[in-house]
């Protein structure tokens, strides 16, 4: 760095560059700079005239280039907040989205505070959904499944750092590891993006298998609707996240496999993103 440059000037310059790839350019710049100087964000506001040394400037430049290349902030910082928990994330896991908190909220509405139910999270990734439910319903026993050993390693790390012990993590393909078991509630944020969706390009840094679900984006949801009746208790609850444009198709799939009391819920943007259904074994035998 040929000349001294203040924190405020670095923030302005960085935010201007990041505006091309981020809707939260100033925040991204603050987080990256705080990381580069190994100080909390509040330090930036209290010391805007302080200058950066060469080592900090080099660290900032490296992370800026990663962000400008489209890498999610969560992968650069290694963490993402979800349900007021700071979760570890890695390129082996999807970055937890704020809209997925709706899925947690819908599930919790149906689970009494003192319930001791068996609950299953399919495709757990970083463990965000399972950890949120396990923390809110500490008498329940959660089982969280993912096909990726690397994702499960991250999920276990999150459970350990949050000291949440009422979760078992299993590796396998969807319901296969729990064949013969029964659960009162099953939750899942499965892949639901069509392989032809142009949005995949903007999500290229994230694991494609956790996003893409066949030609129409409904392959995984169809599999869950078909297979979950075998492992759900009578009148058990299924809660799924899906694309905003998939509301009617998801309802049709659920009905075709005998699910009842199907409801859809809008996220904070007014988009239909989560559906729930119950399965009554007594009415399908």
Name what the model sees in each region.
Residues 216-279:
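Conserved Class I SAM-dependent methyltransferase catalytic core
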Residues 74, 193, 245:
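Active-site beta-alpha loop architecture of Rossmann-like, nucleotide-cofactor-dependent enzymes
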Residues 1-37, 42-45:
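Non-catalytic accessory regions of SAM-dependent methyltransferases
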Residues 281-285:
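Flexible, glycine-/basic-rich loop-and-beta segments that form/coincide
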Residues 18, 111, 159, 228, ...:
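Conserved hydrophobic residues forming the short capping helix/wall of the S-adenosyl-L-methionine
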Residues 191-220:
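Mobile active-site "lid"/loop adjacent to the S-adenosyl-L-methionine
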Residues 98-200, 223:
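Conserved SAM/SAH cofactor-binding pocket of Class I
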